[in-house]
Design a protein with these regions (language model features):
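Conserved non-catalytic scaffold segment of RNase H-like nuclease domains
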Residues: 2-108, 270-315
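Short secondary-structure boundary micro-motifs
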Residues: 19-23, 149-150, 219-221
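Generic marker of residues within folded, mature protein domains
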Residues: 26, 41, 143, 227-230, ...
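Short Asp/Glu-rich motifs
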Residues: 85, 172, 256
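Acidic two-metal-ion nuclease catalytic site recognized across multiple nuclease folds
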Residues: 180-321
């Protein structure tokens, strides 16, 4: 049996202090601090990691960043490079582990910085991880609201014995919040970082959760090409695999950023399909995140209303022209 550790990671990064510097560099955010807590499979802390990093891209601290994290450039001048620190950090993580972060930005920026310095990729496709911010919402709120780490710490009445907004302290508090997740089923709600996209159709993600399915596509050159792909617009029932009958055809909202449909499975009833068009963070390609979710009659009515509202908005725009 594989024993997997949890790596509760937090990063702090600097950015350009002016527009000229920003335009002159392809790296938007330069990581200057890595903090992490390692938990075993029983969620007990077994180790920690913390190190500051010497900047190689931005040599002035962005004013807002400096005021938030209270790090001066002088503190970083004798530190090791990103390649050295990140390399040691990944060795420290070990072989069998899963990243846990507050929100999804840290994993994206870690991989962006690694690619900038020509380090090996963390994965060859979407990377499974736990978004503790999302899990907090599922455990204690409405699944949709996203709170700050400070809010969660206050809500759970966790002792605040160190300051926030440093990589080591925020990783520590994230681990403390995670220790208040008592239902094992909560950890069925994993997330995917999409810095690395599926390379081919065979690599695409099909993940089934309690009451919905998530699909992450390979890259496409544009939205039209994506919507012509059979797998993108497929609506097989995720519970039994049966073909479904279309009730509301795919229609777009938000200038083609989102698409909706309603289908019906003979066995499991109505399903709502939603397509989100996402732009790759690495190039100009787009990819699709599609969800299929069980709904009732009220859910069908909501989609019909949305479709009608979209028609009315488009009609009004045409009338203005």
């Amino acid at each position: 049996m594989i024993i997997m550790n949890y790596i509760l990671m937090d990063l702090e990064w600097n950015q350009a202090s002016d527009e000229k510097t920003k335009l002159a560099n392809e790296l938007l955010f330069e990581i200057i601090e890595i903090g992490a807590v390692k938990l075993n499979d029983k969620k007990h802390q077994i180790d920690s990691f913390h190190e500051l990093i010497k900047p190689q891209v931005f040599h002035r601290m962005n004013q807002v960043t400096g005021e938030l994290i209270h790090i001066q450039m002088e503190q970083l001048s004798n530190c090791r490079s990103f390649e050295e620190v990140a390399g040691d950090f990944l060795k420290w993580c070990g072989e069998d582990y899963v990243f846990c972060t507050w929100g999804g930005a840290d994993l994206t920026e870690l991989q962006r910085n690694m690619e900038y310095y020509h380090m090996s990729s963390l994965s060859s496709g979407p990377l499974k991880y736990y978004d503790i911010q999302k899990l907090f919402s599922i455990a204690y709120e409405d699944r949709k609201t996203r709170r700050s780490l400070k809010y969660a710490v206050d809500y759970l009445e966790i002792e605040q014995d160190i300051a926030f907004h440093r990589a080591d302290s925020d990783a520590y508090y994230t681990a403390k919040v995670m220790s208040h997740f008592y239902n094992p089923a909560l950890f069925d709600n994993y997330s995917f970082d999409t810095y690395q996209l599926p390379k081919s159709r065979a690599d695409e993600v099909h993940a089934i959760f309690e009451n919905y399915e998530k699909y992450i596509s390979r890259p496409f050159p544009d939205k039209l090409t994506a919507m012509q792909d059979k797998e993108v617009i497929s609506t097989r029932c995720f519970l039994c695999g049966a073909n479904t009958k279309r009730r509301i055809p795919w229609f777009s909202v938000n200038n083609g950023k989102h698409y909706y449909t309603v289908v019906c499975c003979k066995t499991h009833g109505y399903l709502k399909g939603k397509i989100r068009m996402r732009k790759s963070v690495r190039d100009d390609c787009i990819y699709v995140v599609k969800t299929l979710k069980s709904i009732d009659e009220n859910g069908v009515t909501d989609i019909l209303k949305r479709k009608q509202q979209t028609r009315e908005v488009r009609k009004e725009r045409r009338h203005r022209l």
